Amino acid sequence: VVRRISAMSPTWGGDFPQLELENIKHAFLTHIHSDHSGGLSDLILSPWVLGRDSPLYLFGPKGLKDMASNITNAYKLDIDYRLDGSQPANEFGYKTIVEEISEGIVFKDTNIEVTAFYNNHGGLKNSFGYLFVSKDKRILFSGDTAVSTNLISYANKVDILVHEVFSSEGFKTKTDDWKIYHEAHHTSSIDLGLLAEKIQP
C-alpha cells in the first residue's frame, strides 16, 4: 500500500505532493486485531526503505509497543543488511515512537487535535475511535464498533462521520454464531442510519 501511495507523489512521478512519504509522520490505530494492524510493518518499514529519515509516531491501545518492537525484531536481518551499505539508508527512519493511549486528547499541533474515545467492539476493552478537529472541520472515525453511546457523545456537531457498517440484508444469511458475533461487535446498516439521523453529520 505504501509503495502505491508513494507512486502518486512527485518524487516518484505522481502529481500529489500531499502523498510524499515524509508527510506520513503519525498513525492512529483503533485496536490490534490482525485485520486492522496487519499492514503496520509496511507503514513502518517501506517509507524508510524509500528514504524517510525520522521515526514514525504511533498511537494506539495497550500492546502496540510490543507489536511495533516485534515487527522491527522480525525484520532485523533486512534492516541490518540495508544499514550495512546495500543501499542508501539511515538509522532513524525504521524506528517508532509509540504512545499507548487511553480516552482523551492524544495529539495536538497547530493544524489538528486528535481525541481518542472508547467504542464498543464486543469484549475488547482497548478499542478506540478518533475525533479529528481542525480549524474548519470535525471528523469522527468510529473504528470497529457496535452501537456506542460513548461514540454518540463525541459525534456531536461532526461534519463528517466515517463509520463501520455491515449489511442488514446480508446479516440475514449468516449462521447464528456469526449473527451473535456481528451484533456484539459491529453496527448494522439500519442502526447506522438511525445514528446518522440522530447526529446529523
Report each predicted region and the residues it spans.
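Cap/insert and terminal regions of metallo-dependent hydrolase folds
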Residues: 129, 136-140, 146-201
